[in-house]
Amino acid sequence: MEQSVRSIDGARSVAGAGRTIIDRESINQRALQLLQRNRQRRLLLKRSEDRARYIPERREQKRELDETLETRNVPQHHISAHERITKAKSHGSKYKPSDLALAEIRKYQRSTDLLISRMPFARLVKEVTDQFASDEEPLRWQSMAIMALQEASEAYLVGLLEHTNLLALHAKRITIMRKDMQLARRIRGQFI
C-alpha cells in the first residue's frame, strides 16, 4: 500500500516538473507577445500623432483663434466699465478632483508607454538578483530582458489593481483598501 502511494507521489512530482517547464515556456512566449504588441501600439500611436501635425484644418482653426485674440487686444480706455468687471470675474473653469482623476485614467488607458521608470526598475531587479547570485560573479542583464520583466510586472500590477477595484466596488466603496488587494490575491491563488 505504501509503495503504491509512493509511486503515485513520484509520478505526480515528475508530472509537476514537466508542467513547470511548460509553464516557463508559456510565460516566456506570453512576455514576448506582450512586448511585440506594445511595440506595435507605440508605432501606431506615433504615426497617428505625426499625421495629426499635418492636418490643414487644425492650422486654419489655430489661425482663426489667433486672429480673434488679436482683435480682442483693444486698449483699456475703449472697454466699458461693465466689460471690465465681467472680465475680471470670469476665471477659468476649475475641474473637480474626480474629473481630473477620470481624465488621468483615460490618458493612461490611451497610452501604451511603460509607467515605471526604467532605471529604478533596473536597479530593483539587479538588487533582487544579487541576493541570489554568488558574490564572485554577479548576474548581468540584457536591456531587453529587463524590458520584458518590466512589461510583465506592469501587466501583473494593472490586472491586480483592476481586480482590487472590482472588489472595492462590490463592497459598495470607491476607495480601494488593503483587504481588497489581499482578497484579490487570495482569489487568484497567490500568496498574501
Swiss-Prot record:
It comes from the Eukaryota. It is found in: Nucleus; Chromosome, Centromere. Keywords: Centromere, Chromosome, DNA-binding, Nucleosome core, Nucleus, Ubl conjugation. GO terms for cellular component: chromosome, centromeric region; nucleosome; nucleus. Pfam families: Histone. Residues 88-190 are annotated as: H3-like. Belongs to the histone H3 family. Histone H3-like nucleosomal protein that is specifically found in centromeric nucleosomes. Replaces conventional H3 in the nucleosome core of centromeric chromatin that serves as an assembly site for the inner kinetochore. Required for recruitment and assembly of kinetochore proteins, mitotic progression and chromosome segregation. May serve as an epigenetic mark that propagates centromere identity through replication and cell division. This is Histone H3-like centromeric protein CSE4. It comes from Kluyveromyces marxianus.
